[in-house]
Amino acid sequence: MAAKIFCFLMLLGLSASVATATIFPQCSQAPIASLLPPYLSPAVSSMCENPIVQPYRIQQAIATGILPLSPLFLQQPSALLQQLPLVHLVAQNIRAQQLQQLVLANLAAYSQQHQFLPFNQLAALNSAAYLQQQLPFSQLVAAYPRQFLPFNQLAALNSAAYLQQQQLLPFSQLADVSPAAFLTQQQLLPFYLHAMPNAGTLLQLQQLLPFNQLALTNSTVFYQQPIIGGALF
């Protein structure tokens, strides 16, 4: 009988202790957190937590930071599509400013390029004809570089006179027959460019020069005879 009473009291004490006890799971951070002082930073507190709990807290922090930004991510494609025309306009303005700066920096080269535009148009329309036209002169320049030096200086000093001279060069057949006579003829042309604004008159003079043997033998005496020039005028 005494044993039964003792067992009954034991069961009653166990039930009372179970009803009033607080269970702490293994993965809970409450025991450790209760021991930490309140003035520690959250970073130090997170380092002192249970290692099992740390990944869950990191995931919770990431989710907390991403969820408020989710409407922005949903609206971002439409905002980018609305900003594309503005981006293209800004890019075009930047290109235009760069071209203006390039033109202002190289104004002389830009003006010379506009003066050489007829030859560039010929090269763009018919590249074969342009190459055939330039081939005899390039061969002559390669064969006689020193004799073509005055023409390079003329191009640097007076581009308009140089262009007039270059426009008349393809009509001269003397370059294919006699390069030496052609070079002599070209050396005489700069002296007539300033007095003959008419290209047709200069072309007629070019056609008459090969028949004048005095120009090929003695250019000084030839300069003193304005017979051909006066007859043409």
Swiss-Prot record:
Disulfide bonds: none
Signal peptide region: 1-21
An example molecular function term from Gene Ontology annotations: nutrient reservoir activity
Keywords: Repeat, Seed storage protein, Signal, Storage protein
Protein family (similarity comment): Belongs to the zein family.
More details: The alpha zeins of 19 kDa and 22 kDa account for 70% of the total zein fraction. They are encoded by a large multigene family.
Job of this protein: Zeins are major seed storage proteins.
Protein name, per record: Zein-alpha PMS2
Organism: Zea mays
